[in-house]
Curated annotation (Swiss-Prot):
Odorant receptor. It comes from Homo sapiens (Human). This is Olfactory receptor 10Q1. Residues 1-29, 80-103, 165-202, 264-276 are extracellular. It is a multi-pass membrane protein. InterPro entries: GPCR_Rhodpsn, GPCR_Rhodpsn_7TM, Olfact_rcpt. GO terms for cellular component: plasma membrane. It holds the Pfam family 7tm_4. It is found in: Cell membrane. The keyword Protein biosynthesis does not apply. Keywords: Cell membrane, Disulfide bond, G-protein coupled receptor, Glycoprotein, Membrane, Olfaction, Receptor, Sensory transduction, Transducer, Transmembrane, Transmembrane helix. PANTHER family: OLFACTORY RECEPTOR (PTHR26453).
Length: 319
């Protein structure tokens, strides 16, 4: 599908506006402050992870390599959505051009898909570390880690580009359509098309299965082997700590994949239109906030590196 047709499918330009969360001014201010606080926490938490991994040689292992890239994805992922969302909460609705909507959709889908593939890669990394500890450094080489990360981005990039191009070659009715969402996501934009969208829905389901179902199954298989390995640990304290870590990781995975599946894989209905934007808040704010907390900030190595970095920074400022 030629990308050049992305914006020129109409004889006249079309723009979209996002439906407001609420028209009550006091609630607008409250929502703005809440989402701004969550966004700043996401920025601080994920930036801290990237900084500490890049500045401490002891954390330059495959696990922390993937964690830092996950944090970078979360930063980009939320930044594509949240600033525009915040600007629309307060004041009058601001229209977004067809090209701007297409760009936001492309980056949102690409980064979100890469995130899903990366979570599967991280589960495989943990499987190798726990089930094959003696061969971990031989298997998880720097070259393999880089190739897997590039593969995740490539697998996300191609279908995202094709899906976005396919959607924005559709005709849209009128020149000032309202999107029943806080971002240019695929399902709400598809509903605005003035054409038969059954083929586009089928493509969306195929892409969703590729991005959501397959990585989730790989994660489940990895954790089945990890669980079997944990059960063989003789120390009760060791088993408890391992299960505690795995349960937190699986909580984030189930939350992200479950919410995304509800939006992209369930049949379309009139009730799902309003529910989609509410569910999307979970994987826009909650999982990007939980990932640095549960994957890294609970880790003793990361906390120790952060503590030593802060002490060194304070000492250098004092001198």
């Amino acid at each position: 599908m030629p990308v050049g047709k992305l914006v020129f499918n109409q004889s006249e330009p079309t723009e979209f506006v996002f439906r407001a969360f609420t028209t009550a001014t006091e609630f607008q201010v409250l929502l703005f402050l809440l989402f701004l606080l969550l966004y700043l926490m996401i920025l601080c938490g994920n930036t801290a992870i990237i900084w500490v991994v890049c500045t401490h040689s002891t954390l330059r292992t495959p696990m922390y390599f993937f964690l830092s890239n996950l944090s970078f994805l979360e930063l980009c992922y939320t930044t594509v959505v949240v600033p525009l969302m915040l600007s629309n909460i307060l004041g009058a609705q601001k229209p977004i051009s067809l090209a701007g909507c297409g760009a936001q959709m492309f980056f949102f889908v690409t980064l979100g898909s890469t995130d899903c593939f990366l979570l599967a890669i991280m589960a495989y990394d943990r499987y190798v570390a726990i089930c094959h500890p003696l061969h971990y450094t031989l298997i998880m080489t720097r070259e393999l880690c880089t190739q897997m990360l590039g593969g995740a981005l490539g697998l996300a990039l191609f279908p995202s580009l094709q899906l976005t191009a396919l959607i924005f070659t559709l005709p849209f009715c009128g020149h000032h359509q309202e999107i029943n969402h806080f971002l240019c996501d695929v399902p709400p934009v598809l509903r605005l098309a003035c054409a038969d969208i059954r083929v586009h829905q089928a493509v969306l389901y195929v892409v969703s299965i590729l991005v959501l179902t397959i990585p989730f199954l790989l994660i489940c298989v990895s954790y089945v082997f990890i669980t079997c390995a944990i059960l063989s640990i003789r120390s009760a304290e060791g088993r408890r700590r391992a299960f505690s870590t795995c349960s937190f990781h699986l909580t984030v995975v189930l939350l992200q994949y479950g919410c995304c599946s509800l939006v992209y894989l369930r049949p379309r209905s009139s009730t799902s239109e309003d529910e989609d934007s509410q569910i999307a808040l979970v994987y826009t704010f909650v999982t990007p906030l939980l990932n640095p907390l549960l994957y890294s900030l609970r880790n003793k190595d990361v906390k120790g590196a952060l503590r030593s970095a802060i002490i060194r920074k304070a000492a250098s400022d004092a001198n």
